[in-house]
Structures are given as C-alpha cells and as structure tokens.
C-alpha cells in the first residue's frame, strides 16, 4: 500500500509502518549532543560534537533521498542497500579545515563509522584519504543542501575551536612521548596513541549514532546515560552497604581474630587509604587468599567517589573466577541491579534479554564484571560492537585480577592500552596478582611506573605462607608416565586425605583420571575437571567437590587442567602440579591449605611428565614457561638462600620472569601476525608495511599522522586461538535435552530460537575443527 505523505528532502531515517521520518538536522544534532555529553574529556567535546554534525552528510545525496522517499511510500523493499553516507562529510570537513592533520583526523573518524578500515592499504598502498577523494559521489549537491541546513560561518567558528582542541590532544601525546624517550622506560609511541585517541572518538560517534537511530525506530525519546550526580549517589550507597557487609562477615567468621584475618584487614585498610591519592596506576601484590577481590573493590568504591569516576570495571581471566567473584561483588555492595556481568554464560530471565543485549553493547552500568577477552576485544577488535563501548573505559576504574594471565602475545598491546587510559583519559588501573610479572624495562612499550597499593609484598609472605613447594621433577628420569603419576597421587592421597592434580593438557588429565579410577579403592571420591566439560557440568562438579572437602569424611582426588588454578575457592591437603610456569605453581598452591585449616604446612609437588604422557609440541607458551622455571629450580637446588629458602618468594618470582622474558623470540610480545611479516603493535603504530606500499604506489613518502592499518590489525586480533571456535551443545541433563527438543521444532520464531540458544550456552563446549572431524557422526 502506498503512503500519501508530504516528502522532505533532508531525511536521515524513515519508518514506513508509521509514516514517521527524522530529518538530517535532528539526527546529526542528536548524535552530536549525545556523543559530546558522553565524552569524559571536556576539552574534546567540541571536536566530538563537530564529528556528530558531519558524520552522515552523505544521506543528503539525491539517490539517498530518493531511496528514503520510496521507503516511505512503498516500504522497505524499495530500499537500495549500500549507498555511501560517510564520504561527503569527510570531504566537507577537509574543505572547511586549513589544518591538514585536524581534517585528516576528523574525516578518518567519519569514514570509519560505518565499518573499520586501514588508513593505508597493505596490498596496494592506497591511503584511505586517496580512496575517498577519488570516490564518485553527489558532492556538489550534498554540499549545497548541507549549507542550507547549517550556517557556514557558525561551523567555521566551531572548526577553529576544534583545531585548538586537536592541538592540545597532540601536545599531550608529544610531551608524554618525549618524556618516555629520555627515561629508561620507553612507554609507547605517538602513532599508537593517536590511533587509540581516534578509536575512542569513533566509539563515541558510533554509540551516539546507534543510540539515536534505535530510539527513532522504537519511537522513544533519546535515552540518557547515567549522570555524574546519579553515579555519585550510587557510590555512596555502595560504600555504606560494603562496610556493613564486611562488619557482619568479620563478626560471623569463627576464625575472627586469627593472624590471617588481621593481615587481610590491614591490606583492606591500605587499599582504602590509597583511594584518597591522585595516583592512577597501582599494583596490588598480595598472596593468594589475602582477600584482594574485596580489598580492591573497597579501593575502587572510595576512589570512584573521590575522583568522580563513572564506572568500576572488574576483569578476570577465566569465567570460573568471574562467576564466583561477580556474586561476591553483588553481595558486598548490596545493589545487584547495578552490576553488569558480561560473559558468554550469562542467561537472562524472560523479558530481560533486550535490556541485557543493550547493556553489553554499551556497558552503561556503574559496575561491569567481564573477562580479559572482552576488554581486550573492546580495545583492539575490528568489530563495531566492541568499538562502540570503548569510551566506557575512560574516566573509570579498571581492576585486572590475576593480571599475570594476560597472554604473552598481548603484553605490549596491554601495556600501551593501560598507559593510554591512565595518562590521557582519566582512568585508574589496578593490576592484581599474587605473582606479578616483573616491571624490569623491556626494549620498548613498557607499562608506566606503578605504585604498590599495599606496600611491599614480602611483608605478608610469611603470614600467608600455607604450603611448602617441593621439586619432584627428578623422581623419574625422562618424566612420569600416566601410571607413575597415578601411583604417586594415590600414595599422597593416603597420606594427605585430599589431592588436587593439575596437568597441562586435557588429554593427560583425562588419561590420569581414568588410570586413577582403575587403581583407587571404591571408597575414594574421584573427580575430573576440564574445558571439555560444559559450564553447567563444571559448576555441578565444583559444588560436589566443595561439599566433600567440607565434610572431610572421604578421601578425594580431583584431576584437572588449569581451569581451577586461580580464583576457585576450595582447599586440598596436597597439590600435585605438572611443571609449568612458577606463576602457575604458586596459583595452584593457593588451592592447598587455603585457610591454614590443616594446622601444618600443605604440600605442593612439582612433577615432570614424559613427552609421551603430556604432549606439548603445539603449546609453545607452556614450554617457554617450563624452561624458565627449570633455571629457577636449578638455582634453588644450588643455593636456596638466594630465594629465602622458598620457591614462592618475591626473589624466585622475579628470577622466573626475567628468565621467561629473556628467552622470548623477537616480537613475540608484540602480537605477531602469521600471514604478514609484521605485528599488531606495528600495524597500529607506524604501519611500515603500508607506508612502504604507499611509496611504491605514489613514488613519495606519505605525509600523515594516521598511517595505521586498523582493519587488518583488528581482524587479526584474537585473544584465544580460533582453534576452539566450533560450538557443540552437550545433552548434559533434562533441561539441556528439553531445550534441544524445542530448538528442533519446525516454524520456531527467530526470537524464540535466540532465547533457547542463549540458555544452551551453559551446556556448550568449544572444540577444534580437527576434533570435530575425529568425532564425525558422534556430534
């Protein structure tokens, strides 16, 4: 049916069903205002606002407007897809600005808001600016129409202010770069930081654009983010609830007054005191079991209140830690509704899926609890949904728990991102770990100097020492076979009642579990844990393990991969850990005699598996870690006094990391790209590969401060290898089977399918293509 309506010629959005439309002026001003209000740096608001005004100017083209008119009259089927909306805005900006670097920055943001791209093409050397300058568009018409909507003189004045804003931004980068160059710690380069600035401004534009567009089609007023005043009120309420919660916990704790709780309180108080300081980069280095989750949260709440931060973002390396600590955070602050838990295993109640989807896209929540994978994707992925929420990291407090688990290949990217957020965007970062990586300077891209939030780590080492770590790697020449390890574990379980075995591969863990089932008495309780189990299976298994450990009525063995190594709150009498990094060994030791409940030292054995039992040929990081640990073990054997007679000393940890980093290949910490002879650090910096191609194409050097290959880098960036991207749903229990039955029904609506698939995530396992082929018809 045809709509009979009056057609305007400056349309930005149209809705056939209702006959409503939004003009270009309405949309561009909404986006400009929303993005500027969201921007946490007041000095950048004018520049961000200007970008909002120009971002969709291309929609004024005659072909675009004809498209909109047809949609209004005949419906969505009349729409011609793929018309360029961004090129005209960038070219108009370049015409208005005399300063090339400023116009290039703004136009690049506009060009990229419909999809990431490379500023210089790695294959043909063409720059993004050249590509858009050569593009055939309805430019003269668009320009004429635009200046009928906007006053040119007013925009010129805005441009002058934006130039000043840009120069201040560039000046900050140059000052930091110069100071970094003359110091012993080179902490980044201007190209990389300029690229991150661009990404955050792009984030603000995308968020504003998507938000206004969604509000138009939903026919609701433009939504507002939580205001600073509302956030301050929330922090006050959280602090009051937190202190009441901790007081009750202390009163109800039967071990109240013991030496561990005294030191936990001291650490918590030091974190509280640090909250009043202006420092923006901290390390919290305390032993496992010292309460760093709640201590760092206490710091964050008080610091957020004092420095008017918008968000507290808690990051954990694994879902197992995240789920456990998210629940602890919710209890402690007494306001579960302000905690956004963002990871793949979250299942929403009926009716709340859309709100959760929106929150995970924007992170518009006071407290966000998420994984290292999610935050690293937010910083470096090419996906627009990741870019959209990046600005949320600004003017926030970010707590990285178990920071040593950040992959080695991401190390320099991580360092530079932390430097950028803390030095330029008012963010405070806390790096938490019992085994902090060394801060000894590397050649370049170091993290800035950190302050220890709770003083020197060795102060608490003796108080929290609950285990003796014993080197048993030489018990079997050539390493233990599965049978040797199983007998060893059985013997230790007879002696210690409960044993946790942590191995480096899922195959070795499963084979050991099967062998133990064959040789252990029936009264033994045997458990197995690995990422080959679906999340619900892991949760149920952990619950059973904790129950038996608490009852202390049976001998128990748990054989696991490193999925239980950090953050899982249970305690065994003995731990057997296959040789890995010293950080892994110490984290594993944190699952032994956790609360000093044994009345003696717990025992942790480091064992060496044979090459046949534990195949590590494809696990380079583990082999590197083993080699670094081997040097520490040899030094300890020759002179244990240099490590204060314990393998978990600060001296041993420092020696381990120095060994580890010294043996890495060139560029291994810069995120090497297999198909390119370059790294992501390079692509997001000077992009020498692209610049060389530009010279070949144009016969001269490129004159730009934005040579980055954002798209190539973003597509290559993945924290976890693509090897495990095949998802398999396991019919683990009745609920899983019922959901699978529903999903197989014919004519199921798309929305219902999405709900079922979301609920099935707790029953889903990631496997490799190779394993999928091996399983064949079994899946």
Model-flagged regions — what are they?
Residues 2-18, 24-240:
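Accessory nucleic-acid engagement/destabilization modules that flank
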Residues 14-16, 340-353, 504-507, 526-542, ...:
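Conserved helicase motor
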Residues 102, 106, 422, 483-496, ...:
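C-terminal helicase lobe and adjacent C-terminal extensions/tails of nucleic-acid helicase motors
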Residues 278-300:
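Walker A/P-loop
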Residues 309-332:
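Conserved Walker A/P-loop ATP-binding site and its immediately adjacent core
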Residues 335-380:
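Inter-Walker segment of RecA-like/P-loop motor cores
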Residues 387-396, 404-460:
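Post-DEXD/H (motif II) to motif III coupling segment of the RecA-like Helicase ATP-binding lobe
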Residues 435-492:
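Interdomain hinge/linker at the junction between the two RecA-like core domains of SF2 helicases
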């Amino acid at each position: 049916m045809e709509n009979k309506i009056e057609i305007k010629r400056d349309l930005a959005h149209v809705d056939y069903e209702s006959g409503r439309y939004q003009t270009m002026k309405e949309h561009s001003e909404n986006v400009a205002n929303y993005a500027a209000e969201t921007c946490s740096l007041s000095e950048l608001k004018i520049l961000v606002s200007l970008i909002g005004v120009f971002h969709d100017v291309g929609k004024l083209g005659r072909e675009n407007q004809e498209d909109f008119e047809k949609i209004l009259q005949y419906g969505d089927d009349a729409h011609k897809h793929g018309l360029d909306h961004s090129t005209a805005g960038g070219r108009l900006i370049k015409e208005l600005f005399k300063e090339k670097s400023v116009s290039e920055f703004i136009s690049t943001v506009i060009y990229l808001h419909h999809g990431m791209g490379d500023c210089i093409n790695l294959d043909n050397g063409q720059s993004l600016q050249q590509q858009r300058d050569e593009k055939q568009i309805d430019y003269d018409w668009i320009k004429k129409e635009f200046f009928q909507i906007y006053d040119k003189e007013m925009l010129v004045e805005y441009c002058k202010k934006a130039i000043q804003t840009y120069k201040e931004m560039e000046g900050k980068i140059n000052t930091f770069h110069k100071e970094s160059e003359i110091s012993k710690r080179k902490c980044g380069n201007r190209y990389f930081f300029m690229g991150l600035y661009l990404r955050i401004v792009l984030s603000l534009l995308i968020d504003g654009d998507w938000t206004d567009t969604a509000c138009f089609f939903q026919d609701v007023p433009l939504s507002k983010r939580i205001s600073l005043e509302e956030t301050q009120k929330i922090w006050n309420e959280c602090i009051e609830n937190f202190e009441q919660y901790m007081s009750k916990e202390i009163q109800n704790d039967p071990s109240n007054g013991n030496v561990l709780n005294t030191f936990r309180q001291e650490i918590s108080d030091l974190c509280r005191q640090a909250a009043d300081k202006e420092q923006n980069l901290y390390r919290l280095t305390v032993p496992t079991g010292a309460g760093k989750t709640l201590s760092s949260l206490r710091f964050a709440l008080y610091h957020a209140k004092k420095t008017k931060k918008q968000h507290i973002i808690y990051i954990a390396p694994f879902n197992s830690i995240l789920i456990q600590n998210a629940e602890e955070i919710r209890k402690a602050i007494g306001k579960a509704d302000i905690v956004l838990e963002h990871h793949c295993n979250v299942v929403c109640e009926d009716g709340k899926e859309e709100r959760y989807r929106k929150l995970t896209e924007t992170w518009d929540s006071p407290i966000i609890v998420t994984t290292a994978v999610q935050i690293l994707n937010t910083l470096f992925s090419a996906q627009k949904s990741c870019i959209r929420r990046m600005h949320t990291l600004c003017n926030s407090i970010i707590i990285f728990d178990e920071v040593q688990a950040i992959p080695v290949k991401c190390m320099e990217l991580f360092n530079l991102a932390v430097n950028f957020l803390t030095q330029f965007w008012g963010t405070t970062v806390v790096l938490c770990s019992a085994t902090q990586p060394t801060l000894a300077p590397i050649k370049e891209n170091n993290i800035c100097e950190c302050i220890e939030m709770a003083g020197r780590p060795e102060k608490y080492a003796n108080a929290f020492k609950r285990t003796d770590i014993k080197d048993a790697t030489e018990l079997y020449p050539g390493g233990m076979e599965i049978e040797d390890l199983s007998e060893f574990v059985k013997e230790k379980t007879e002696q210690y009642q409960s044993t946790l075995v942590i191995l480096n591969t899922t195959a070795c863990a499963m084979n050991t579990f099967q062998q133990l089932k064959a040789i252990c008495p029936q009264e033994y309780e045997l458990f197995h844990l690995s990422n080959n189990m679906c999340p619900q299976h892991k949760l149920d298994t952990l619950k059973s393990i904790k129950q038996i450990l608490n009852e202390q009525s049976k001998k128990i063995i748990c054989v696991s991969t490193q999925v239980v190594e950090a953050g899982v709150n249970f305690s065994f009498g003995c731990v057997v850990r296959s040789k890995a990094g010293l950080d892994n060994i110490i984290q594993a030791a944190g699952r032994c005699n956790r609360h000093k409940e044994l009345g003696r030292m717990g025992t942790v054995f480091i064992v060496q598996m044979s090459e046949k039992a534990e195949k590590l040929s494809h696990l380079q990081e583990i082999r590197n870690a083993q080699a670094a640990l081997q040097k520490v073990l040899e030094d300890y054997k020759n002179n244990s006094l240099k490590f204060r007679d314990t393998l978990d000393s600060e001296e041993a940890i420092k020696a381990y990391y120095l060994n580890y980093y010294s043996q890495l290949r060139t560029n291994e910490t810069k995120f090497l790209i297999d198909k390119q002879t370059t790294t992501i650090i390079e692509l997001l910096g000077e992009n020498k590969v692209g610049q060389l191609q530009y010279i070949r194409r144009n016969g001269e050097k490129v004159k730009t401060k934005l040579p980055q290959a954002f798209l190539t880098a973003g597509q290559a960036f993945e924290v976890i290898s693509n090897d495990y991207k095949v998802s398999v749903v396991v019919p683990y229990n009745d609920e899983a089977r019922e959901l699978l039955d529903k999903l197989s029904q014919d004519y199921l609506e798309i929305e219902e399918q999405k709900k079922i698939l979301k609920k099935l995530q707790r029953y889903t396992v990631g496997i490799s293509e190779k394993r999928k082929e091996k399983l064949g018809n079994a899946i």
